[in-house]
Design a protein with these regions (language model features):
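Extreme N-terminal starter segment of soluble prokaryotic enzymes
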Residues: 1-4
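Short glycine-rich anion-binding loops that position phosphate/pyrophosphate groups of nucleotides
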Residues: 10-12, 76-79, 102-104
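Glycine- and acidic-residue-enriched helix-capping/strand-helix junction motifs
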Residues: 15-29
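Short beta->alpha junction loops
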Residues: 45-55
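Short, glycine-/small-residue-rich phosphate/pyrophosphate-handling segment
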Residues: 47-48, 106-146
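Short Gly/Thr/Asp-enriched flexible loops that form oxyanion-binding sites at enzyme active sites
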Residues: 63, 82-91
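Short acidic/histidine-rich motifs immediately flanking catalytic phosphotransfer sites
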Residues: 64-71
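Short, acidic/small-residue loops that bind anionic groups at enzyme active sites
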Residues: 91-107
């Protein structure tokens, strides 16, 4: 069975409440439940995790590196700041997909730089919640090629 880890970074626990004009009206629990059901139908195990703490995200990437086939991450605000999370990905060498609900390149100037895009397998940005489905499909396809 394919094991996929979904990590959501800071403030994504506020989905549905935080700036719905940018991030939509679904909450994180709804998104995760839909993805878990989809993954199960495709014979995959999807584990979901959200944290506002950079160190917890780094710890999780390290801890799950041996049991995870691919990681999907929405790093939230850490996209533009976290060398520590970037270094964790480089250290464990687990393929990962970077995802953003909004198009980070169509927003404020400081949001246009990602510390992850150049080391990610791929980046999905600007498709709203559908981006999570696209990332899950891409992760499953990536694993089937191994």
């Amino acid at each position: 069975m394919t094991n996929i880890l979904l990590i959501n970074g800071p403030n994504l626990n506020l989905l549905g409440k935080r700036e719905p004009s940018i991030y939509g009206d679904k909450d994180l629990e709804q998104i995760e439940q839909e993805l878990i059901e989809k993954a199960s139908k495709l014979n995959c195990n999807l584990e979901c995790f959200q944290s506002n703490s950079e160190s917890e995200i780094v710890d999780l990437i390290q801890q799950k590196s041996q049991s995870t086939d691919v990681i999907i991450i929405n790093p939230g605000g850490y996209t533009h700041t976290s060398i520590a999370i970037r270094d964790a990905f480089l250290a464990v060498e687990v393929p990962f997909i970077e995802i953003h609900i909004s198009n980070i390149f169509a927003r404020e100037e400081f949001r246009k730089e990602s510390y992850f895009s150049d080391i990610a397998v791929g980046v999905i940005s600007g498709f709203g919640f559908e981006g999570y489905n696209l990332a899950l499909d891409a992760a499953i396809n990536l694993c089937s090629k191994k």
